[in-house]
Structure formats: C-alpha cells, structure tokens
C-alpha cells in the first residue's frame, strides 16, 4: 500500500488489493512481474521476483514524485503467513516475533512436521518502520484487504507473538521533494523480502 500522509488517501502499487483510480501497466517475464501506476502525482513501479538460488521472494518498490509539490507518504507491505499446506489449518500454530538486531518480522510453525525448523521473514531496511504481526488488528473487525483498518492509523502497533491471527505488516514513512524529479528507490530501504 502507498498512503498520502496528509490526505489519508491510499492505494496499492499493483491492481490488488486496493486499486487506485488510474490505469495500471503490468509486465510479466520469466520469474518476475512489474506493476506501474500513477496516482495523484505519485508514480510507482513495483517489481516482484524470486531469487534464482534460494526460496526468497523480493518486492522492490520505486516511488517518484511528479506532483509539483513536496509529499509525505508511507509504504506498507503486508503478507499472510501459511507455513504449511492450508492457512486455516496452520494459522493457529504460527508464532510471530521481531528479531532484535535487524527488526525483521519472523514467523515459525513448529508443528509443521515437514519443515519444523524453518523460519520465514519479512523485512525492510529503514529504522523508522512500524510493524504488526496481527492480521485481525491490521484488517480490523470484518475488515478486508481493499480497505484495511491499519490505513486509518498513523502507525502499526508492534504487536507480535502467539495466539494471533498471524500476518506480517511493515510500514515506512518517507518524504519526496517537489519539482526535482525526486524519487526514492525503496530497494535498500524497502525491499520487502519473504522466504
């Protein structure tokens, strides 16, 4: 999700889950997809690809300000953990935590007999991030991905642990300057990585 921090308007850089008002251009290739979109003076390009030599999925977001004024935005990445064959069967066993040194969100399912020692992660390289491991909190009561309750809050709560409806959400606020073709490649600061 991308959100204008001044107006509260939000949209996703891909057609789902929260389609913006403008058109989307989607390109697919061997092992990757690229989504381009322009919304209210903000140009975004989301490149999703998988590593050739490991079980890692990357989402690299490039954001550019073409609005003619400075903008304060936030980018929010969201995934729902499965860690097994079917989410309804595994969700009650998934435990989330935040790794102390890196701040990455981790998830594990020790009850998965096929891979009990595997750990999934979701991370971004930006210290101003906020996180949540609680899907119910992120979506809200009777919430939906096209309009999650978290998009109405300033920050994510930081709630992680056991006995939650598990997810991983990371939100990063950032500023884009005006009239300089200024952009931000959220690749180091916001390469969402899921394994």
Segment roles from a protein language model:
Residues 1-195:
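Anionic coordination/interaction segments
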